[in-house]
């Protein structure tokens, strides 16, 4: 009888199984699209030449850093809006969405202007001693792609707002449109018109512009739970923006430090030789597929948990968090198993040397097994804390763990203990273990429950 009553009670919970499936499915497809398109872009750039690959790669490191900052701000807006939805305060939720769109857009324009003014510093100082040919390709790519910063920031903000209301299908469809334009444009301009690096950059700008316009137009639909005001008059609400920044700034710092850490680790990997660089690059691409379900469902966790916290119902928070973590574990076991089975064929497609293929195989097996066990607790669990407003604790834990264990132990295990590139991946998993321990302790002590933003 108790179990039956409990099941009946859960029928009144915020998200049914069908609603969770409708939320998660498009998110997985969207993440899959992003990974595939990234790989397609790399192949197309490679056809322009090695100097172009180097130039584009250097600029992309800067762009990823900037995009991550605005993605973090978008998460802040989504959490605030989601908590208001949970409180049934749709007016305040819409105000949060409007403030997010304006703040992100204007901030992105300011960053774009700064990048243009600092272009020479980036090319000559940040990128260090690069050849004139590489610098030429980087200059062209940076000049064009920088103009897309406001558009990708606006798209990310809009996508986060749609996810906050539980509608991930819109962001998936707009992402599909954006990526289709990008890939088609690259194919035409790179292979057809053969205009080199500009042929890679122009479709990126156009696709992001179209995505921003489409998602903004959809957000102006006043019949949606979350929508933005149809006005060009800017009215900033300092109190609402502070709430968004309370999540966005710690999350942005965490993401930025993570990207910086990756760059520092790459510089270490480069000292291990050409085979190590190749094995690391291939392993990174394949490892992304192993954790893809986790990344997608972590976005769903932000939506679900923020609404439950807004409703001040922590019984639902615990229920959905355990349920979504279980789904991540099952999905990642299946994904990793498939990749293990297909790994010989995947590595064959890369045409690697025996030494590089052996190193990549060891890394992928180690990463896959570790990811199935540790990754959800290291990265999906803190997504719930951010959704509950506990972003600062996540930031402190992640940054300290990354600098000491991921970076410090990369040198210790990889360089001084002689494990080379494999040691760098061992250090990364040590970082995961430390994060997981800290986040599990925080789950049980309950301190993350006291950070609700609204």
For each feature predicted by the language model, list its residue ranges.
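Small-residue-rich hydrophobic transmembrane alpha-helices
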Residues: 53-113, 152-171, 266, 277-343, ...
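Transmembrane helical elements of multi-pass membrane transporters/channels
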Residues: 22-41, 144, 178, 207-211, ...
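Interfacial/gating helices of multi-pass transporter permease domains
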Residues: 22, 45-64, 132-137, 197-198, ...
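Short runs within selected transmembrane alpha-helices of multi-pass transporters and secretion channels
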Residues: 74, 144-163, 171-182, 200-215, ...
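Residue-level hotspots within the lipid-embedded alpha helices of multi-pass solute transporters
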Residues: 31-35, 68, 108, 112, ...
């Amino acid at each position: 009888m108790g179990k039956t009553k409990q099941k009946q009670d859960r029928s009144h919970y915020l998200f049914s199984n069908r609603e969770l499936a409708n939320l998660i499915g498009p998110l997985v497809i969207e993440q899959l699209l992003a990974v595939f398109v990234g790989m397609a872009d790399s192949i197309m750039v490679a056809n322009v030449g090695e100097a172009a690959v180097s130039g584009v790669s250097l600029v992309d490191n800067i762009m990823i850093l900037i995009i991550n900052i605005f993605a973090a701000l978008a998460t802040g807006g989504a959490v605030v809006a989601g908590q208001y939805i949970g409180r049934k305060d749709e007016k305040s939720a819409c105000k949060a969405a409007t403030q997010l769109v304006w703040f992100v857009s204007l901030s992105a324009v300011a960053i774009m202007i700064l990048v243009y003014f600092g272009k020479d510093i980036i090319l000559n100082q940040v990128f260090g001693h690069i050849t004139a040919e590489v610098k030429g390709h980087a200059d062209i790519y940076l000049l064009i792609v920088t103009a897309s910063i406001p558009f990708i920031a606006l798209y990310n903000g809009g996508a986060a707002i749609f996810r906050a209301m539980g509608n991930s299908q819109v962001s998936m469809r707009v992402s599909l449109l954006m990526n289709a334009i990008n890939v088609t444009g690259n194919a035409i301009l790179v292979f057809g018109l053969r205009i080199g690096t500009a042929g890679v950059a122009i479709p990126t700008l156009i696709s992001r512009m179209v995505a921003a316009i489409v998602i903004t137009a959809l957000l102006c639909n006043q019949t949606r739970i979350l929508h933005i005001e149809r006005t060009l008059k800017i009215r900033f609400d300092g109190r609402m923006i502070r709430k968004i920044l309370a999540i966005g700034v710690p999350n942005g710092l965490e993401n930025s430090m993570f990207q910086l850490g990756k760059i520092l680790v790459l510089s270490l990997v480069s000292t291990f030789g050409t085979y190590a660089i190749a094995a690391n690059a291939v392993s990174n691409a394949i490892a992304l597929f192993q954790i893809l379900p986790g990344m997608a469902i972590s976005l769903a966790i932000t939506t679900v948990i923020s609404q439950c916290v807004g409703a001040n119902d922590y019984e639902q928070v615990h229920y959905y968090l355990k349920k979504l973590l279980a789904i991540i574990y099952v999905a990642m076991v299946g994904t990793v198993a498939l990749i293990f089975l297909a790994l010989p064929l995947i590595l064959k497609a890369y045409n690697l040397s025996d030494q590089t293929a052996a190193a990549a195989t060891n890394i992928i097996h180690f990463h896959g097994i570790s990811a199935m066990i540790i990754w959800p607790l290291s990265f999906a669990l803190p997504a719930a804390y951010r959704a509950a407003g506990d972003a600062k604790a996540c930031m402190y834990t992640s940054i300290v763990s990354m600098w000491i264990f991921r970076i410090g132990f990369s040198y210790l295990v990889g360089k001084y203990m002689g494990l080379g590139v494999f040691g760098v991946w061992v250090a990364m998993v040590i970082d995961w273990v430390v994060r997981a321990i800290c986040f599990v302790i925080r789950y049980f002590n309950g301190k993350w429950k006291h950070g609700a933003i609204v």
